[in-house]
């Protein structure tokens, strides 16, 4: 799924940003008349949106959806990237053009440009611009993040000590580093490389936040929901030791329970499968998949209730957040927040924004975090964050 341009933009730095976006999205019917500007505040209408069977990009032998019944057409989509915590900015938007390729069918959903005399010509024009070759970064330079390696290790040591005193059961410490390129970073290049190198992850690029997340916060389709919880990490090839590590198994149990307990309140027939070993090119994780039937809650209600999970914050949530505010001298922004999409039917996917970087001009800010337990080793936790930064570094060819 690819969105080009913006027909409507919603931004919020409020603690209830997810709820605000849900209310605005539900008050924005696809058939509403177009507003006079390309951005709107919560509650304002979105441009009229309509799915259009698109055949112009089909290659010989590929299926096209021209003969699909109208009921099979996808509905308009809202993309969103939410902050880890307020007052960092959350952003959501309806693309001017959304391209969906599913089950051999290609659809173009237009918003705004759907009012053009020739919508398919507008689609072709947008695609022609998007097909320009991605710019390859060169002459990279690397810089320290908000905390030096020594400062971060010291904070981990202090956090583990606080956990041993009973301040919380687990807390997550994040860190960052910077990469600079004189030509700037082309998000399309990064996304293409991540897709090649990490195909089993959920790749995303939303408002300059680009990544390849292995962790699905919540997905909904046709009344069923699923979530993938990750906690407990080791180097590739060390999975058996991870599977028998009391520290990592306890960390994973806390993360899995933080998701299951919320879904049990809001969904039906909750079932957990795991933990199992999830091997990725850069790390191996303990993973649990959770499935349920959707009740009366909307997908964005589940996103708001689940975030932040123990996998990115800690547990108990409020106690862990206090430790993060005290000891983590890194502004996460939208790193480790929910990122994904939702359509007008309430179906969608929201991953946790992990293994990602924020592109801003000539700077790319990379993020990673580690779950800290009372017996955590600061050196091992630092090594874990370095492994988690590999996807973006691999994409850059470093």
Model segments located where?
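A residue-level signal for conserved active-site and pocket-lining positions in enzyme catalytic cores
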Residues: 80, 99, 166, 218, ...
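Non-catalytic accessory segments adjacent to catalytic cores
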Residues: 16-33, 66-178, 246-249, 266-268
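An anion-binding catalytic pocket shared by soluble metabolic enzymes
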Residues: 89-98, 106, 172-254, 346-369
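Extreme N-terminus nucleophile/cap motif
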Residues: 1-12, 22, 167-168, 180-193, ...
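Contiguous alpha-helical scaffold segments within structured protein domains
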Residues: 1-15, 114-115, 121-157, 179-180, ...
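Long, intrinsically disordered low-complexity tandem-repeat segments
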Residues: 30-34, 39-52, 57-68
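Conserved hydrophobic core element of enzyme catalytic domains
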Residues: 296-398
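A short glycine-rich, hydrophobically flanked beta-strand micro-motif that places a catalytic Asp/Glu
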Residues: 78-82, 202-207, 333-340
């Amino acid at each position: 799924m690819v969105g080009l341009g913006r027909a409507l933009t919603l931004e919020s730095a409020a603690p209830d940003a997810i709820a605000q976006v849900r209310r605005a999205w539900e008050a924005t019917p696809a058939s509403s008349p177009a507003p006079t500007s390309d951005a709107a505040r919560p509650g304002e209408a979105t441009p009229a949106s309509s799915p259009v069977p698109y055949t112009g990009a089909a290659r010989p032998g590929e299926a096209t959806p021209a003969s699909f019944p109208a009921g099979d057409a996808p509905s308009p989509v809202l993309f969103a990237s939410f902050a880890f915590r307020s007052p960092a900015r959350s952003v959501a938007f309806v693309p001017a053009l959304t391209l969906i390729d599913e089950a051999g069918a290609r659809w173009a959903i237009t918003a705004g440009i759907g009012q053009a005399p020739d919508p398919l010509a507008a689609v072709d024009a947008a695609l022609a611009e998007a097909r320009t070759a991605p710019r390859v970064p060169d002459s990279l330079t690397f810089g320290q993040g908000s905390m030096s390696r020594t400062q971060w290790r010291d904070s981990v040591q202090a956090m583990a000590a606080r956990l041993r005193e009973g301040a919380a059961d687990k807390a997550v410490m994040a860190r960052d580093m910077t990469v600079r390129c004189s030509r700037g970073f082309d998000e399309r290049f990064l996304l293409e490389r991540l897709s090649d190198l990490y195909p089993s992850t959920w790749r995303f690029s939303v408002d300059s936040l680009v990544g390849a997340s292995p962790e699905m916060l919540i997905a909904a389709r046709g009344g069923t929901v699923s979530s993938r919880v990750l906690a407990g990490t080791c180097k590739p090839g060390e999975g058996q030791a991870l599977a028998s590590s009391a520290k990592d198994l306890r960390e994973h149990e806390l993360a899995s329970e933080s998701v299951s307990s919320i879904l049990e309140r809001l969904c039906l027939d909750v079932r957990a499968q795991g933990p199992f070993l999830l091997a990725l090119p850069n790390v191996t994780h303990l993973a649990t998949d959770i499935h349920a039937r959707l009740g009366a809650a909307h997908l964005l209600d589940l996103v708001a209730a689940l975030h932040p999970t123990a996998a990115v914050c800690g547990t108990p949530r409020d106690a862990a957040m206090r430790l993060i505010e005290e000891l983590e001298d890194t502004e996460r922004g939208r790193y480790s927040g929910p990122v994904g999409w939702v359509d007008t039917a309430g179906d969608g996917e929201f991953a946790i924004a992990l293994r990602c970087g924020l592109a801003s001009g000539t700077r790319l800010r990379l993020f990673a975090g580690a779950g800290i337990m009372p017996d955590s080793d600061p050196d091992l936790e630092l090594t874990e964050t370095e492994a988690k930064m590999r996807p973006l570094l691999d994409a850059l060819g470093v």
